[in-house]
């Protein structure tokens, strides 16, 4: 959209009003004016808080304005080949210079556990489960997460994953539940069928039995999952919301 423009010119173009966009004043319906005022607030914020980063030069603290920030959110245009290089450079800089140890992802609890398991083990089966969510971006995602796995090993395993989204694929979420389960512990008889389905990777059956077990056998589920039970509860809540939606 803003080809051949500098970052400053692109921001200015984004904040153009109907009067300034083409040099002529245009009548604007009232509903459009209301929406325009909302957009002006967004554009003003972006204009006041945007710092262009040029990838021909190394990143430095000044690129981020305030070195005390603890959360960094980056946008991207999906499908662009430079995205992966940007993500690598950004995370490596933030980890080494700003102490960032957590990679945020747009996934729910279960799907995030699949990624976390890959990051801990390097087992490609876990990565492949996650890639089912990525569609046409699967190749770029695979490249990034394989890089992050190797980088995390070099950093002593100090990097973790946290999900901020919803459960998009219930089968993948069930694999996340499998990652939370302790395969060495024998479950109570009341939830044995659920655990067996999970271990057999019969995920559609496990999904139905999981919902029943959480409703009817919460104590047995808490005993089986132990310290991970809070995450299991959040996964169950996420699935309920998704089903309702």
Predicted segments — roles?
Residues 2-6, 14, 19, 23-25, ...:
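Structured catalytic-domain cores with a bias toward divalent-metal coordination
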